[in-house]
């Protein structure tokens, strides 16, 4: 019942959408996400191995990805590495885009309307920068879930800024495993 309610509230996935799986099923989070996919009627794409997650994401083109913070940290580090090896102009455009995205995310995370000029700037940022990050993750990612350990605030802010929200959950094996989580429109980063 709790998993059903939480998935409905979050709009986790719809029938026919693709969820991406690499979490071990011996762990309650991975197993619960598998059961949730069966219940919701999603298609599960599996990573070939942990070292090929990014390549597998591009091939599978998932809508949903549950993961532990370490995976999001690795993706963030790869994006930062690409930024650092870019030209000065590209770094300026990247930094401007992330700043715009963070401002937009503040409105979205509290369920407030985004001002028109900020929405326009965000569409430009998406076209110039964010679309490339989305493409590396398959281009259809709607929701990412993090659990198993605390997710660094800087990393979560970045993903929200680029339009790839990560919803943090907390739970225990005994709570199957999600006890509480952030929901779209009511996100408090770092909680």
Each model region followed by its residue ranges:
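Conserved adenylate-forming
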Residues: 47-191
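Conserved AMP-binding loop of ANL adenylate-forming enzymes
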Residues: 7-48, 53-57, 64-67
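Conserved structural elements of the adenylate-forming
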Residues: 1-12, 131
